[in-house]
Structures are given as C-alpha cells and as structure tokens.
C-alpha cells in the first residue's frame, strides 16, 4: 500500500529545498536592486507576490496571512515607485536559472524534462480558495526554458499547499502570529523568531501567547506538548 503521508513529507522537503533558497538569494536581491529598488527592499515579498500584487496590497495581505500588513504595504509601494511586478518576476526567474546552474547543475536537465508533467499536476489541483496558487498558475510558464518552467510548476504546487495551510489555520482560528509561535516551537527555534521576522510587535506577541495559553498550549511561557501535538 502506498504510504501517502511519507511520500507527502518527502515531497514537502524536496519542494522546500528546490524553492526556498530563492527567497534570500544574493543574485536575486542584486538583480532586484538593479531595477532601482533601494537596497533591494522587499525582494522576498514583492517577487513572491508579483503575480497577485496588481490586485492590491490588501489582497496580498489577505493571501499571505502571516505577514504584517505594514510590511507588505511598504514593500509593494516601494516596488511600484521604481519598477513593475512583471520586471520583479522576470529578474527573480533569471536568478532561479542562474542559481540552479550554479548550485545544482546535476538536476537541471532531468528537472527540465519533467516540466510538462509538473504543470499537468499543477493544473489538476482544485483552484477554489487557493488565491496565490491561482495567480501563479495564470502567469507565464516560460516553456522555452524547461528547467525554469519546471521550477515554476513546483512553485505553483507549493503555493497551493501554502493556500491550504492558511485555510486550515483560519478554520482553527489560529492567527498568523500564533501560527508562528507554534512553528517556532516545532522547529526548535529560539523565542519568537518566526513571528518577529514577519513583523509581529510586542503587543501582538503578548496577545498571541495569551490566546495559546487559554487553549492549553503554553506552560511556563513555552509551547507545551499539547501545543506541539496540535501543531
């Protein structure tokens, strides 16, 4: 019998390794800066939300769920002053190709050969309620560059997973800050690094801790076993 849970865990880790590095890639940040954006401000938020950003800041804030509204407003407003979201997407994609060729050249040909199958998988997913996925699915697929196209397909699938994740959090009445605290504990990160990195301030953190405590997930100021099991 197929162990779908194990396969899903493997796929999750593989997709994270294939996609996640681009969010902090020096080449991507440099190319984004060269578009005129001061110090590459907001590279992560702008390039990840580019297919959705023309719908407006509030739409991106709603879709991203765990990132503070003021962070998103700053990043997208600065980007609009200096470039377009299409250009931000283009240079991010340039960095993807450069990075794959530099860091993992051994996978380039085989990954590229999977592009059509990966897009078939992406297209097969249910679209309802999956906003970021839908936006990425609708943008150019760069079929003329197979490895980039394959990467974009995996990214699209990964955003579908993210949309699903946020829907589950919302259904459980877990805020973005609370989710960050639970995930910090699960990963063994110190303190409140994840919600802080997404813009949470002291007041928001205090509120989140209080809510988690009331749900029985906190002991002595730390997420307890019940909280970890819930997460």
What label would you give each PLM region?
Residues 1-206:
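Phosphate/adenylate-binding glycine loop and adjacent helical scaffold
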């Amino acid at each position: 019998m197929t162990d779908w849970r194990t396969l899903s865990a493997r796929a999750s880790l593989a997709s994270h390794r294939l996609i996640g590095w681009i969010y902090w890639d020096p080449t991507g940040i440099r190319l984004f800066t060269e578009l005129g954006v001061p110090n590459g401000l907001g590279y992560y938020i702008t390039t990840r939300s580019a297919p959705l950003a023309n719908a407006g800041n509030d739409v991106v804030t709603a879709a991203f769920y765990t990132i503070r509204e003021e962070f998103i407003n700053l990043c997208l407003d600065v980007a609009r002053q200096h470039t377009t979201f299409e250009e931000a997407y283009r240079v991010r994609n340039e960095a993807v190709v450069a990075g794959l060729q530099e860091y993992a050249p051994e996978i380039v040909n085989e990954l590229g050969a999977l592009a059509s199958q990966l897009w078939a998988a992406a297209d097969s997913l249910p679209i309802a309620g999956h906003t970021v996925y839908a936006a990425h699915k609708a943008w150019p697929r760069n079929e003329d560059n197979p490895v980039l196209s394959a990467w974009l397909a995996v990214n699209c699938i990964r955003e579908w997973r993210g949309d699903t994740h946020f829907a589950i959090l919302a259904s459980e009445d877990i805020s973005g800050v609370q989710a960050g605290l639970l995930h910090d504990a699960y990963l063994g990160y110190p303190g409140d690094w994840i919600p802080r990195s997404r813009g949470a301030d002291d007041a928001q953190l205090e509120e989140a801790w209080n809510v988690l405590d009331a749900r029985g997930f906190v002991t002595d100021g730390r997420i307890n076993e019940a909280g970890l099991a819930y997460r």
